[in-house]
């Protein structure tokens, strides 16, 4: 039975599959067990709890509690993972009882659309987002955690404005987290409030700390590269980095290259081409760096190296020499801006970058393109969608360069105020003699 609707009392569920098994029940010489299909490669605790509820509902209907429940993860040749329900029963009953008690003691009017991971795919997300924004919800403060929100509410701080106006030092000792972390989110809320009241994006520079922020900015070099990946984690068993984009200057002229990879062989080739380009460019510009925004790109490079067992020494050289520079890490320790998220797109008003690709068009193109990739139909990708996604990728690469240049201006501003901001040490990426001898 596919998408079987289940109900018992006030509890309802809809299992992906009810599988008939040989076990006598009130239905006859057979009974049913729940099977759920998931996109996640690792089964999470919430999935097991979900299956426990389905199984309990099935048990009420057929007069026999199923012994097992099953999960079909992606790329498993449709072989289910089996979970013995008795192993999780006690915990399930505790969680279910706690939830029921919570609902029984709460006025239905007191429910509130707190942000959760399901918001990303929920049809009510727009309405809930509007309510949170109308209410100046604390979740709109960049970098705040749910634990911090809970503790702030315990002390009567329920909105971003109240947090922005909270006296420092904090008038209480946090039960969870440090005083510094609460001071940090208070200051973040203050800058966001100032930006809203001024009608423009405000920012302030943080005091430099050795090893963080602006002290991690290397000397700009004519050979510097700015790169960004577009990937889809649901293509095949391991995902696909389908566009490797990088931006650089040659003879004073700006260049962008987008290496498309719509299958495994092309992905390997694109990875090798990019690494070879960087290594060859190092011969001409030995002090170049490769800039990116966030940790995705270095992680993707390592995955590709491991997946295809290629360019290990070359990537090792780049990592040892700290050639890769994460500007998100620099920003987090150097700038406090009146934004709700430190996405590079939210920061672009600071450094004056205007995108060529319109984000609504990009979102639609990405959706269509990735559906083709996930459906193993790369030939179905429209040329217009590919062009839109490539412009979007180029925007990300060029925006990263604009951000680096803007950070250099802020660094110089502090230096002119008499603040010392050293450059990071230049490191030779070659392996040590001991490692070289061991490898030989």
Model-derived segments and their meaning:
Residues 1-23, 27-102, 246-248, 256-366, ...:
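Conserved DEDDh/DEDDy metal-dependent 3′-5′ exonuclease domain
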Residues 1-37, 194-245, 274:
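Catalytic cores of nuclease domains that cleave nucleic-acid phosphodiester backbones
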Residues 69-135, 146, 155, 339, ...:
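Acidic, Mg2+-coordinating catalytic module of metal-dependent nucleases/exonucleases
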Residues 139, 149, 211-216, 230-234, ...:
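Generic recognition of flexible, low-complexity loop/linker segments
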């Amino acid at each position: 039975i596919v998408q079987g609707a289940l109900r018992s009392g006030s509890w309802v569920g809809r299992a992906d599959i009810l599988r008939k098994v040989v076990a006598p029940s009130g239905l006859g010489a057979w009974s049913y067990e729940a099977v759920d299909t998931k996109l996640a490669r690792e089964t999470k605790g919430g999935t097991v709890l979900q299956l426990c509820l389905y199984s309990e509902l099935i048990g009420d209907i057929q007069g026999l509690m199923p012994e097992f429940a099953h999960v079909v993860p992606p790329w498993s040749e449709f072989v289910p993972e089996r979970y013995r329900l008795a192993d999780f029963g006690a915990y399930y009953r505790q969680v279910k009882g706690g939830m029921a008690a919570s609902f029984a003691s709460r006025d239905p009017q007191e429910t509130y659309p707190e942000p959760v991971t399901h918001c990303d795919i929920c049809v009510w997300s727009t309405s809930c987002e509007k309510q949170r924004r109308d209410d100046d919800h604390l979740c709109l403060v960049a970098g705040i955690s749910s634990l911090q929100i809970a503790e702030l509410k315990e002390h009567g701080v329920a909105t971003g404005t109240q947090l922005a106006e909270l006296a420092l030092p904090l008038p209480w000792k946090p039960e969870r987290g440090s005083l510094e972390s609460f001071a940090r989110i208070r200051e973040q809320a203050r800058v966001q409030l100032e930006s809203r009241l001024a009608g423009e994006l405000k920012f302030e520079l943080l005091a430099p700390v050795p090893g963080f922020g602006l002290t991690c900015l290397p000397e700009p070099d004519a050979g510097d590269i700015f790169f960004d990946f577009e990937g889809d984690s649901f293509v095949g068993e391991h995902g696909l980095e389908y566009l490797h984009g990088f931006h650089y200057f040659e003879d004073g002229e700006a260049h962008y290259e987008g290496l498309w990879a719509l299958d495994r062989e092309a992905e390997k080739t694109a990875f090798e081409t990019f690494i070879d380009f960087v290594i060859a460019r190092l011969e001409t510009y030995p002090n170049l760096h490769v800039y990116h925004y966030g940790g995705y790109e270095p992680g993707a490079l390592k995955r590709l190296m491991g997946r295809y067992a290629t360019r290990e020494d070359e990537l090792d050289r780049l990592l040892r020499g700290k050639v890769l520079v994460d500007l998100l890490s620099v920003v987090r320790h150097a700038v406090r801006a009146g934004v709700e998220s430190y996405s590079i797109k939210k920061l672009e008003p600071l450094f004056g970058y205007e995108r060529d690709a319109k984000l609504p068009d990009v979102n639609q193109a990405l959706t269509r393109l990735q559906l083709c990739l996930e459906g193993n139909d790369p030939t179905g990708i429209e040329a217009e969608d590919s062009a839109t996604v490539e412009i979007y990728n180029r925007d990300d690469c060029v925006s990263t360069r604009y951000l680096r240049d803007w950070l250099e201006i802020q660094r110089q501003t502090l230096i002119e105020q008499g603040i010392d901001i050293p450059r990071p040490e230049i490191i030779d990426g070659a392996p040590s003699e001991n490692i070289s001898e061991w490898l030989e």
